[in-house]
């Protein structure tokens, strides 16, 4: 019977594990919903900010505007902002974005450019520190749902790097949220800022829904049609000063959106990983139950044979 006991113990262990993975899946799903609500809540501000920036840019298009955040310099050094997670159990989320950042660093090195990392997330920080890569700053322990305060703190560090000319360009490496089962590490330039194209900026809002007992994502593309400011609008301050003050806010807003996308990607990856783990646990329980029943039947048959054999020996 020890074989039966070991199988029974293993079945119970797998059942307990399945309870944990199922709970983690539901928690991740709830947090994806919160991330979705945050994206929707911050969108009106982002829309209005883009419209004001476009209006100011249109008003100043014939003037010689020299703003540090818009000035493109000869690139000798690049800052790489990498957004990863603090925890594992989320499939290939962390591995994919770290590999993308590492490959980009190798490309810059081949081009003869210096680089330094600004890291968000414990996983990327541990990876690059073990490999003794240059890290200017790191941020760990951020909220599961990113906040504007966190985005502002990171943006201040990036502004310091760029304005001090320690780096001539800052690139963002993050994971773009596509669906619950798909995400894509992408790279975009954060600094110097480029406000071109704000007159028709396409954006997407994702909504977590259920269908047939399964979670799925609905995506809606929204177009922001920015309009020039009224010609008779009078500014108390110089429009150049207003634009200069709004550009850091625009940077923080771009960064917040990247943090939101990365958080949604991580949560979706964790939800998918835990769902797969729960399914695999269910299949393993079925297989172990079948093995247990076969072993139990074999044990009963053996006992019957022993009883019959003993009875025959007595006759």
Swiss-Prot record:
Membrane topology: Peripheral membrane protein
Localization, UniProt: Cellular thylakoid membrane
Any GO CC annotation of this UniProt entry: plasma membrane-derived thylakoid membrane
UniProtKB keywords: ATP synthesis, CF(1), Hydrogen ion transport, Ion transport, Membrane, Thylakoid, Transport
PROSITE patterns named among the record's database cross-references: ATPASE_GAMMA
Origin: domain of life: Bacteria
Chief location: membrane
InterPro entries documented for this protein: ATP_synth_F1_ATPase_gsu, ATP_synth_F1_gsu, ATP_synth_F1_gsu_CS
GO molecular function: ATP binding; proton-transporting ATP synthase activity, rotational mechanism
Pfam families: ATP-synt
Subunit organization: F-type ATPases have 2 components, CF(1) - the catalytic core - and CF(0) - the membrane proton channel. CF(1) has five subunits: alpha(3), beta(3), gamma(1), delta(1), epsilon(1). CF(0) has three main subunits: a, b and c.
Family to which the UniProt record says this protein belongs: Belongs to the ATPase gamma chain family.
Record function comment: Produces ATP from ADP in the presence of a proton gradient across the membrane. The gamma chain is believed to be important in regulating ATPase activity and the flow of protons through the CF(0) complex.
PANTHER family registered for this protein in UniProt: ATP SYNTHASE GAMMA CHAIN, ATP SYNTHASE GAMMA CHAIN, CHLOROPLASTIC
Annotated protein name in UniProt: ATP synthase gamma chain
